[in-house]
């Protein structure tokens, strides 16, 4: 088990540690005439949980495939664990744990057999595979399902097994591509708990996600990607403080009313965003915004005052919501 101090240190730092486990400078990926990743820079420190946040097509998965040494870079430099993927790909992959966006489990094998066979790929002895499999089944809360065929597992169980399998080689860095896509809320929260336990152990996590709450829960630091570029970087709290107000007021009006609102909303908030189904008003005191709106005779059908999130950061940076 790795020492837990790097995780604690990383979470208290505003800048990357001097020694990076992963370092990219001008990292670029092209597919013919299309640029999927456009000259991005980032560092991942030991013990850090680092995220790539952005919509589908932003370049997140292409970046992860380059880090995982399964897709060559088209330009710039990339160093992983101090090595060059173009030269040291097999050595790097032996020290990584990879959780792809789509599960690649052997459906006809049992839960335990999936772990044992994967361990053999890394040259582990049968006894060592068995020991690690027992530990990982317990970690993934799948001990009671060890003899079940994978095809009989729920989506959340399959995802936990995929993560457990990626840990069989005791990796220094975990790569997780959209780890909770398609899972129900209960399964997502259970998976977050397992990943948080890995953070506590000091395992370095690198993940992609388009879920704002997931990024806020798991990431010490993240980059926001859009159209193949990095448009912002920082901790979730730093990004929200920099690009949003403390609170957001969401007002929904009857159909046809939105087009008549511009003059009536002017001056109510520091920033106003018009979405197809609602208006967002950014100000530190949401209740004061609601009172001022009512004082102007506005009658929204629904009112919601909430704290700002990374969704608001993305909207500020790109002019659209992450769901667009």
Predicted regions mapped to residue ranges:
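Conserved catalytic motifs of ABC-family nucleotide-binding domains
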Residues: 170
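ABC transporter nucleotide-binding domain
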Residues: 192-284
